[in-house]
Structures are given as C-alpha cells and as structure tokens.
C-alpha cells in the first residue's frame, strides 16, 4: 500500500454500499478479497492511530451494518477511506434530549504519507455531495483531535458540541430544519 507521494495522479473515489459489496462478492470474489484485505488493513491503521481497542472499519461491518464506504484510490491502491451510516441517537440541544435517526461519520482515515495534500477534503466533499448533506447535519462518532481540527479548518466557523454518547455535533445542528438522515 506504499505509493510514493510524488506520484499523485490517477486518483479515484469509489462508493461502496452494502448492496454493491454483496454483488461484488458474488460476481468477482478475487476483487472482493483484495478490497477486503485493503479495507481491513486501513481500518486497523485508523483504530491504532486513535488508540482504540477494536477495529472500527472492516468490509464485514460495512455489509452487516448497512454502512457506506468511500474509498480513495491511486492506481488501484487504497490510500484513504471514509465510512458513514445511520444511527439512532439521543442528542442534547442544551435544553432537551432528542431521539432521532442521524447521519453519522463513523471513520475517516488517509494514509500518513498522503496527508496535507487536500485529499481528505476531496474525499469528504465527495461524500457530502453524494449524500446531499452539509457537515453541520452529520454526527461525528468520537472524533479524534485531528478530525476536529480538520472540521474547524475547512468548515469554519464551527463550534463542536460533545454529546453524552461520545458523538459530536455542530452547534447549528438543531438550528436547521429536521429531515431524513441523508437529506431525504
């Protein structure tokens, strides 16, 4: 998975839904296994960097939990990923507790040697456009300091509010009209 940073061409973002992955597994098992190895390895890197005891992202949990995975590849090699899904959460707005189905960013990782090149922002913006959602309408699952800094840098001004369930939301989350998890 080590691609020299100076070779920054042939970048591609691929979206993998549960249905896409099940179809790939049944139609091209070799490609499925390669993707599975790459995603599982990157999921381990992401969890290790966040000092988590378990792995957040594997191809199995994408299909089991009906999440969506966005993969950033260069010349067929995985260099970044972003996992989103819908969760039923209790969110506190400062006065009341609200239970709702929420669009959530569950994992986001770019290989170390590809950071600080705008690739994370490109991947993040691709997901926002694909899901027709704004960053302030997402709930962020226990975001690392790096992710919080990323959000503040690229989507400023933003005040992030920690929730009792370890999710974080933008201060304006409750100020926007409520709709389905992904703008539906």
UniProtKB/Swiss-Prot annotation:
One Pfam entry name: Acetyltransf_16
GO aspect biological process, one term: regulation of microtubule cytoskeleton organization
Record keywords, A-Z: Acyltransferase, Transferase
Enzyme Commission number(s) from the entry: 2.3.1.108
UniProt domain N-acetyltransferase: residue ranges: 1-174
Residues that hold acetyl-CoA according to the record: 108-121, 144-153
Catalysis: reaction(s): L-lysyl-[alpha-tubulin] + acetyl-CoA = N(6)-acetyl-L-lysyl-[alpha-tubulin] + CoA + H(+)
Entry coiled-coil feature ranges: none
Cellular component GO terms, alphabetical: microtubule
SUPFAM superfamilies given in the database record: Acyl-CoA N-acyltransferases (Nat) (SSF55729)
PROSITE patterns, A to Z: GNAT_ATAT
GO MF term list: tubulin N-acetyltransferase activity
Annotated site location: Crucial for catalytic activity: 50
Similarity section: Belongs to the acetyltransferase ATAT1 family.
Cited function: Specifically acetylates 'Lys-40' in alpha-tubulin on the lumenal side of microtubules. Promotes microtubule destabilization and accelerates microtubule dynamics; this activity may be independent of acetylation activity. Acetylates alpha-tubulin with a slow enzymatic rate, due to a catalytic site that is not optimized for acetyl transfer. Enters the microtubule through each end and diffuses quickly throughout the lumen of microtubules.
Name of the protein in question: Alpha-tubulin N-acetyltransferase
Annotated source species: Plasmodium knowlesi (strain H)
Lineage: Eukaryota, Sar, Alveolata, Apicomplexa, Aconoidasida
């Amino acid at each position: 998975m080590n691609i020299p940073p100076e070779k920054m061409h042939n970048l591609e973002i691929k979206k993998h839904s549960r249905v896409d992955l099940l179809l790939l597994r049944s139609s091209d098992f070799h490609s499925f296994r390669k993707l599975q190895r790459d995603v599982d390895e990157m999921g381990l890197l992401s969890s290790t960097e966040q000092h988590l005891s378990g792995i957040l992202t594997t191809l199995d949990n994408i299909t089991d939990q009906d999440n969506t995975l966005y993969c950033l590849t260069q010349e067929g090699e995985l260099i970044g990923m972003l996992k989103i899904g819908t969760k039923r959460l209790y969110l506190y707005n400062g006065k009341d507790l609200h239970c709702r189905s929420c669009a959530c960013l569950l994992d986001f990782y770019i290989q170390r040697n590809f950071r600080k090149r705008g690739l994370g922002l490109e991947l993040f913006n691709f997901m926002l456009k694909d899901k027709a959602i704004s960053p302030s309408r997402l709930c962020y699952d226990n975001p690392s300091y790096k992710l919080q800094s990323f959000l503040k840098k690229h989507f400023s001004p933003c005040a992030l509010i920690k929730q009792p369930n370890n999710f974080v939301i933008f201060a304006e989350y409750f100020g926007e009209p409520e709709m389905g998890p992904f703008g539906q």
